[in-house]
């Protein structure tokens, strides 16, 4: 596993960071979720992600929206990326606990940075008929999140 650094430099006095490495989720879906929660308060983002997991609220898909139907709310096409939301919620909880450890107040913090990078591809094969095999690759994602007390 390669060493991954944060893509922005943040002030360590009033920020907390968290990172998830090589998570087995879709890069496209996780990008859309991160774009939606960026700029939210940490408590709002946690509630939003829990609603997505419960399939009560859709995530608007702006870039990868082909085939996504119209959903209720201010969006054209949207989906319910449950597995990506679960992993991003884990990273958010980790960032909140890091803030609490540093003596910051997690309830008053905003997500100033939520980004993904594609991780390594885990190559695999699926056996097929007549002795053949088809490739079955698993994509991974690296998620980085930074919370700050000031916007």
From Swiss-Prot:
Coiled coil: none
Region (Disordered): 1-23
Lineage: superkingdom: Archaea
Record field: compositional bias (Polar residues): 1-18
Record InterPro entries: Ribosomal_uL22, Ribosomal_uL22_euk/arc, Ribosomal_uL22_sf
SUPFAM superfamilies in the cross-refs: Ribosomal protein L22 (SSF54843)
One BP annotation, GO: cytoplasmic translation
Molecular function terms, GO-annotated: rRNA binding; structural constituent of ribosome
GO cellular component, one term: cytosolic large ribosomal subunit
CDD domains the UniProt entry points to: Ribosomal_L22
Keywords, ordered alphabetically: Ribonucleoprotein, Ribosomal protein, RNA-binding, rRNA-binding
Subunit note: Part of the 50S ribosomal subunit.
Biological function: This protein binds specifically to 23S rRNA. It makes multiple contacts with different domains of the 23S rRNA in the assembled 50S subunit and ribosome. The globular domain of the protein is located near the polypeptide exit tunnel on the outside of the subunit, while an extended beta-hairpin is found that lines the wall of the exit tunnel in the center of the 70S ribosome.
HAMAP family: Ribosomal_uL22_A (MF_01331_A)
Similarity-based family: Belongs to the universal ribosomal protein uL22 family.
Family matches, as NCBIfam families: PRK04223.1 (NF003260), uL22_arch_euk (TIGR01038)
Name of protein: Large ribosomal subunit protein uL22
Organism: Methanosarcina mazei (strain ATCC BAA-159 / DSM 3647 / Goe1 / Go1 / JCM 11833 / OCM 88)
């Amino acid at each position: 596993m390669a060493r991954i650094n944060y893509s922005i430099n943040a002030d360590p006095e009033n920020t907390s960071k968290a990172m998830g490495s090589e998570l087995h989720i879709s890069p496209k879906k996780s990008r859309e979720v991160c774009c939606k929660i960026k700029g939210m308060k940490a408590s709002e983002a946690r509630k939003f992600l829990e609603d997505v997991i419960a399939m009560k609220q859709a995530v608007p898909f702006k870039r990868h929206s082909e085939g996504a139907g119209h959903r209720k709310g201010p969006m054209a096409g949207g989906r319910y990326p449950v597995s990506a939301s679960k992993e991003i919620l884990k990273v958010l909880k980790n960032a909140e606990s890091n803030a609490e450890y540093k003596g910051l107040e997690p309830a008053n913090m905003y997500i100033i940075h939520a980004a993904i990078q594609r991780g390594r591809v885990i190559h695999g094969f699926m056996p097929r008929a007549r002795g053949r095999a088809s490739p079955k690759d698993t994509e991974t994602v690296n998620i980085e999140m930074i919370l700050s007390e000031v916007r």
